[in-house]
Amino acid sequence: AEDLCMAVSQSGETADTLAALREARKSGARVMALTNVVGSSMARETEGNVLFTWAGPEIAVASTKAYITQVEMMLLIAVDLGRKRGVLSPQRAQQMLTDLAALPEQAKRVLELAGEAQRFASRHFDRKHVFYIGRGLDWALAMEASLKLKEVSYIFSEAYAAGELKHGTIALIEEGSLVCALLTQRTLAEKTLSNIREVKSRGAHVLVICPEDLCEQARTVADEMWLIPNVPCLLYTSPSPRDPKTS
């Protein structure tokens, strides 16, 4: 079989993911699982083709460490596949691994924003809806952030690809709407800034979350701004505060 199907599930028991895995196997694809639970259905049904995240029990309703370890594991898989296929140089691969190992220290700096986040929540806790926007990798982050807000605060929230705002989404933005804009993709920064200007023109209150090297550009459009450390763009999807040497 030339196709590989990777099933990702914290519990290893997610019914629809299991069904998709079984269907892929029936179709002749090789299957593997990425899960947090040893002895789960996915671990058994992939017959040893399984990678465990070893995140420990997930207690919170909103997935935190399980999600983070899944993203990190998939990044490591991508780096290794890139090296083996010859599309990623050994030097570039090593640099990505070095950057990933340094990420816990960078994440600790982000945790210092806790007080600022609490004050932000105190100002906006009575919002009826919150929108998240971003481009590229930032859209994936926006979807996860929106999910976390819904699960924890029960505030209606949706995430949208910033480039698709004009296709109906912009009509939902009204005076006083809270929009959280993620701006970490440097090559897409100008386009995202243009989208932020669009929502501001409709009266939105905008929080921009961006790295330090984009703060001057973001300052021109943001009502509020949180600065995060400068790291390679791909690593913004993997916000681990853990030390990979000890966990």
Q: Residue spans of the language-model regions?
A:
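Active-site phosphate/pyrophosphate-binding segments
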Residues: G48-L178
